[in-house]
Amino acid sequence: RLIEYGEEHPIEILLVDESSRALVGDVKAEQVMVLCDGELVDGPDIFPAIYKYQSGDCIMREVLASYCSRPVEPALALLGSRALVVGIYSPVNRCFKSSLALTIGQVMAKKESVLYLNLEEYSGFTRLINSEYKADLSDVLYLYRQGGYNWMKLKSMISNWGNMDFIPPVRYAEDLSQVAPEDMAQLIDRIARESGYDRLVVDVGQMGRGALPVLSMCNVVYMPVREDYISAAKIEEFEEYLEEADDAGVRDRIQKLRLPRHTGIAKQEGY
């Protein structure tokens, strides 16, 4: 029946177990992958092997990663409108910026498809959700610099937390410093245009004046602020910079937020 189906319908990926491995020779499939139990099997037909005793999300990421290792169309993308890019940024420290970004992402994800992107040097994200990842934003940036980026490859690096999808943050802080702010902005724009998500939430790190190109890609920028004298001085200095840069577009999209102070979250379980 599968052979007949392959004659009439294109099969891009065929995922089989080891017991069916010898039976797929007559099936017309672009790529065959084998679910294995950990032992290497020799044979004339060498198919990519995927360890089957792992979570479904991990299996799916390995399938997509293997599929994307083949040459693909450079312009491969999901059709649809550009995602609304929501930036979370503040020149003020310890203002619950990342808490706000994660909350906005989870709330939006209840009704829309959301992708969360963290651009901080030290996000603490993997410890927050107690998970480790084989691929992260460092790999995305490498692909983009090498000209090998496309949406299918990015999809293999995306994980899920609650209702929200996310790209795991960089492993090493220096990976962010090796990317020009303009290139980062172009990457964000490309993800927004090609990913098929409704919303792209970007937690913008302390990029100095390099944050401006990234903020320019955002449809709206939420800026948590504090009312103490030092924080107010930082906000005023940032606004003066926007005036000097003559970037009314970014200035008009900024919405300042004064968040309630909370001290009850002391452990990762609180999130």
Sequence positions of predicted segments:
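A short, well-structured beta->alpha microelement
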Residues: R1-G25, Q206-M207
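Local beta-strand N-terminus motif with an aromatic residue
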Residues: P10-E12, A29-E30, M164, Y197-D198, ...
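Short, well-ordered beta-strand core segments
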Residues: L14, V32, A49, L200, ...
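Extreme N-terminal, non-catalytic leader segments
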Residues: V16, L23, V27-V85
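Short acidic, S/G/P-rich loop/turn micro-motifs used as interaction or catalytic elements
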Residues: S19-L23, E39-V41, N93-F96, Y172-V179, ...
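Conserved catalytic-core segment of NTP-binding enzymes
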Residues: D57-E62, Q186-Y271
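Walker A/P-loop NTP-binding active-site region of P-loop NTPases
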Residues: V85-G148, D203-V204
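P-loop/Walker-type NTP enzyme "switch/lid" segment
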Residues: L119-R193
